Amino acid sequence: MAPPTCRLLSAALVLLLLLATNHQATGAVVASELRCQCLNTLPRVDFETIQSLTVTPPGPHCTQTEVIATLKDGQEVCLNPQGPRLQIIIKKILKSGKSS
């Protein structure tokens, strides 16, 4: 092959590889699941305002345990899993679950 043809073929190959890589990278759902959801945590939240708690254990997406509280107004907030208030809230939830 002549050098200009070789360069053109190389450029076309690089362009195709970039397009293929870019197409796979557009999966925003996958990308958002591969990082920690809780970048900041609230120091405290009232037990009465919590509708539900979601605990996500450490994994390949995040090395930390994450606790996300859904409040009665629909807002989701991150809580410190080591916080003493959260430990009290978890005990209250477990206690209320046993009594029902």
UniProtKB/Swiss-Prot annotation:
Which keywords accompany this UniProt record?
Chemotaxis, Cytokine, Disulfide bond, Inflammatory response, Secreted, Signal
Keyword Metal-binding listed = no
Q: Which domain of life is it from?
A: Eukaryota
* Compartmental location: Secreted
Q: Which GO terms describe its cellular component?
A: extracellular space
**Gene responsible for this protein:** Cxcl3
Instruction: Give one Pfam family.
Output: IL8
The molecular function terms of the Gene Ontology recorded here are: chemokine activity
Q: What is its main location?
A: secreted
Keyword Kinase found: no
Assigned protein family = Belongs to the intercrine alpha (chemokine CxC) family.
InterPro entries the record matches:
Chemokine_b/g/d, Chemokine_CXC, Chemokine_CXC_CS, Chemokine_IL8-like_dom, CXC_Chemokine_domain, Interleukin_8-like_sf
The name this protein goes by in its record = C-X-C motif chemokine 3
Q: Which CDD domains match?
A: Chemokine_CXC
Q: Which cysteines are joined by disulfide bonds?
A: 36-62, 38-78
Query: Could you state one GO biological process linked to this protein?
Result: cellular response to lipopolysaccharide
- Residue ranges spanning the membrane: these are none
Q: What does this protein do?
A: Ligand for CXCR2. Has chemotactic activity for neutrophils. May play a role in inflammation and exert its effects on endothelial cells in an autocrine fashion.
Query: Could you tell me which species this protein originates from?
Result: Mus musculus (Mouse)
